[in-house]
Amino acid sequence: MTKNEAKIKAKELVAKMTVEEKISQLVYNAAAIERLGIKEYNWWNEGAHGVARAGTATVFPHTIAMAATFDPELIETIGDVISTEGRIKYNQHVKYNDYDIFKGLTFWAPNINIFRDPRWGRGQETFGEDPYLSSTLGSAFIKGVQGDGEFMKASACSKHFAVHSGPEKTRHGFDAIANLHDMYETYLPAFEKTVESGVSGVMGAYNRTNGEPCCAHSYLLKEVLRGKWGFDGYVVSDCGALRDIYSDHHFVETKAEAAAVSLKNTCDLNCGETYSALIDAYEQDLITEDDITVAAERLFMIRYLLGEFEETRPYSDIPFSKLDCKEHRALNLRAAEQCPVLLKNENSYLPLDKETSKRIAIVGPNALSVTALEGNYNAYSSEYITVADGIRRVFTNADISVEKGANYCDEQLCHWSGFQNMISDGIATAAEADITVLALGLDCSIEGEDTGFDNDYTACGDKKTLYLPATQQKLAEAVCDVCDNVIVVLMCGSAIDLGEKLTNHAKAIIHAWYPGAFGGLAVANILAGIANPGGKLPVTIYKGDHNLPAFEDYSMLGRTYRYIEGDALYPFGYGLSFTTYAYENEKIVSADDKTVRISVDVKNVGDRAGFERVQAYASFTDSRTVTPHFQLCGVKAVELAPGESKNVELEIDRYWLKAVTDEGERVEPDGGIALYIGGHQPDAVSNKLTGYSCKKLEL
């Protein structure tokens, strides 16, 4: 069914409804209209890295972990599996007349906000700090979820429009101030590009941007999203965000006024109950029936595109056996093996010899943690393999001991004994081992969405520091005193500085993110060399937090690899491998006013197969405005056997080669353009850490 056909059918159906019936369809738990043969429908479903909150499904690595693959094709495949499992569940729910929450086909994912500040707890849900990477991977995910068949397999939704990245504690009343340069260079591109890619939904954010609530923002919603970009899908509020318009933002005084200003600014669907006041707004002449009708038509267009009203429902032939099937589990493990970033590997300490490794201690709060595999907005797996489980499976000849050693934070309560000091147990275990794997990090009770948990380390899900919690830092440093061979496996959804002592002492450091249900096996396979890490950082790891701007400051100056002041500890785009790649024969293949095509030969000059993430960056200056140090503008994941060479071609959209003026206009830079291609960004720190410089081309 084409979009135009769906629009016509939606218009015809909505024309048969009364005003009250139309209003009943503008809320997430839309009512049935039996006289028209319309079933109830709940729009709220989650699928960021698996079909969430509705029984068993594949739990993929979280979004920030997926981002570390720099691999649009893999992300698209994951999106396709998510919608396949979503269809299986939907078919069963319809069969048994279950139309409850988390049972529909409208997934409110991906989160394409920019991870501008590493303290933000929801950064784990994003594709990182870069506009190009977020645009490219977000579009790939959407393509996978929605498919390219006659009907959408599921509906994806880009969120949270548009300038939104904390703080969690004040998000319901916070005003994010962003100038037009930052809006159009950083905060808006991922939304623009996913609209171009055909995303069917957009979710508005809780906060205000430049004074207006995002879910009732005349400029962002009407002028930019609907006007400039021509978006004709549906807009949904974040859950409870319309209540904030009158209760927290005090933008209007009454519930009816909040409902009216949101609908007038093209927010079609309310996740919440504020639109229960639309009938009052209508009777007070704050809105017209046409306003209500247009919103209802957009929503039914989506339902028609999903095939809800077809006599034979599309995708009804997907067998139930495909849910959590062998193929999906294999993909999940492959993804989990490609997400971790090898930050340090002193003297090629890894991989370990799994046949001769004798005594291995696994110490830390994430040794046996399932929640550190999941992250937030997670599905529920039929099987979880923790770090300890994975190492036991792989290192079958080793004597393995496991000790928690510490809670995530000092203030975290144990299940039955209140506060408990376990550090001495961790030290004793490490002291008896030949190798200690420190399984450190966080979970979504510490960093996440508006957790309501406040202590010295976290504020409602946002970190207060970029270091580990004090109890884990104390454990790690004590382990360093008793064990020479320490490997750090860090599991969290953000950037963390491990501190000078641990960073210097550790033989190897792996940032494993929230790696999904099979993350522990993936980590063990990497430790043993069964898998070769190839992930790249989708965020900057800063040296502590001393030079970070204020969390509430939405200016990009001093933020991310594009505007950092000073050197990063580990730069965006960086990540080591167990093999080495060589780049040569770089050239510009073609250039016109739309695209630039560049190519390079990439050779695996090591003795292990691996995936290289080829990255292209632009550097340009313009006398009219501030420009980034570098801007990622192309990526491609390439698998290479030992000794194998491939010619890799990247097509670069000129969009990413333009400077953004203070008025938000993209213009040709007047200072020239340099292109760099390699396995990292072309900064001095990356060059030093990897031992080579990127290839340079003048455009």
PLM features: what roles do these ranges have?
Residues 684-699:
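Short beta-strand elements
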Residues 1-663, 668-681:
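Glycoside hydrolase catalytic-domain context in secreted enzymes
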